[in-house]
Amino acid sequence: MGLLDYQTIKQDFPLLQTKMNGRSLVFLDSAASSQKPRRVIDTFANYYRCRNANIHRGAYRLSYEATDLYDQTREKIARFLKARSPVECVFTRNTTESINIVARSWGEANIQAGDEIVISELEHHSNLVPWMMLAERKGAVLKH
């Protein structure tokens, strides 16, 4: 695979066509909220217009269709990530929620008093705080 042309990729992201103070927008807060390519925006808009229904619990056609789309998406993601099973892929709202789930589940089960939790000094606040709180609860040491 050759180098990616960032200008071509940038064209797929509508918000990145915005000018701020007369200059092209550069968005560097993707840990908090990543920008979406046009294809994702269009796919979600179509889903909400035509397919939005409860998944895995409705007993009507639209719910069955939404469930099928959800399950197919999970299977595609599992293949892309080379997961052993689609059930290994968990959907969350965002990175913040995901890292909190990891810290509150894996961290609670595995971190013990005196253990060292090592993170980068460059971490986003949403990745720093869950580990700080876990270290405090467990008597572990947070290093960065």
Question: Which functions belong to the PLM regions below?
Answer:
Residues 1-144:
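Pyridoxal 5′-phosphate
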